[in-house]
Amino acid sequence: MAGVRLVDVWKVFGEVTAVREMSLEVKDGEFMILLGPSGCGKTTTLRMIAGLEEPSRGQIYIGDKLVADPEKGIFVPPKDRDIAMVFQSYALYPHMTVYDNIAFPLKLRKVPRQEIDQRVREVAELLGLTELLNRKPRELSGGQRQRVALGRAIVRKPQVFLMDEPLSNLDAKLRVRMRAELKKLQRQLGVTTIYVTHDQVEAMTMGDRIAVMNRGVLQQVGSPDEVYDKPANTFVAGFIGSPPMNFLDAIVTEDGFVDFGEFRLKLLPDQFEVLGELGYVGREVIFGIRPEDLYDAMFAQVRVPGENLVRAVVEIVENLGSERIVHLRVGGVTFVGSFRSESRVREGVEVDVVFDMKKIHIFDKTTGKAIF
């Protein structure tokens, strides 16, 4: 097995910079997620690691081997990188059986027939495909086809798996099941895996670490807890989480409040101290709080002083059964709360809303970078 390292990698297509100053280290055996919206550069990054695209600048290492460095004229072709890719499309050969589809990469490498048979059957057992080995792809469900595509990658025993949105063609229920299966499989095999997705749920539930990208730039790398609880900037904070984080413009006042114009909230002493030391008192900031950190006061699980209780008008209630997504307004300020199912708020009525000030985030108004 091997880790993967990118050092100051750029990719430019004409006048478009698809990837900019990308430096990332994926540890041996790690499940790394490349997460971001469409067009952020995540698939281009994966293709450069695979050798399907050549970087415009920078170095790429697989294990200790330098596989790409334009300045030194080094570019190792995909077949010599000991990687296996799984794509969004299953790319199975329709005229071949499941057995032959899985065996195909080994036949190309002229592996002895007996070894091919042994490895194919081992992989089929691992993926629950043993009973399907004689079937053709058209006779399989979407989930079964995806497992065959995975089997074809696994059977090669590569150093690194590269996966480009492999679950996006599956229906929602099957995606949930395949997420768990993929994570379990990666743990069993212990193979370094780099997985591209735009789906934050896939990223949060599957990855050891998540690399969040936007507009070709790496925004933050961290564990699911780190990128959720301590986002580096407003992009990461808003991209991860559903419903997304509330962002409100506010001014830090000299008496220790954040003032939204329509209402004020009392900062905790250590929060006000940090903002004071960094020169933010009297300045505009972006106040962030996740919907689950707002409570219907009747069911609040946190003890809150009166300064952090706000009376708001309920505009819309989305009943999800286990929770209620409540759209709220105070004058011209709007925000969203995720209330417990016991809350019976109705549209058009007023409700007292509790802000859990221990969970707030403050961002620089100009740069969007997190202050805390």
Curated annotation (Swiss-Prot):
Coiled-coil residues: none
Record keyword 4Fe-4S present: no
Induction behaviour? Induced by maltose and trehalose.
Major enzyme class: translocase
**EC numbers:** 7.5.2.1
Regulation of its activity: Inhibited by N-ethylmaleimide but not by vanadate.
ABC transporter domain spans which residues?
Answer: 4-240
Q: Name one Pfam family in it.
A: OB_MalK
Q: Where are the transmembrane segments?
A: none
Its principal location? membrane
Question: What is the annotated role of this protein in its UniProt record?
Answer: Part of the ABC transporter complex MalEFGK involved in trehalose/maltose import. Responsible for energy coupling to the transport system.
Return the protein name.
Answer: Trehalose/maltose import ATP-binding protein MalK
Underlying gene: malK
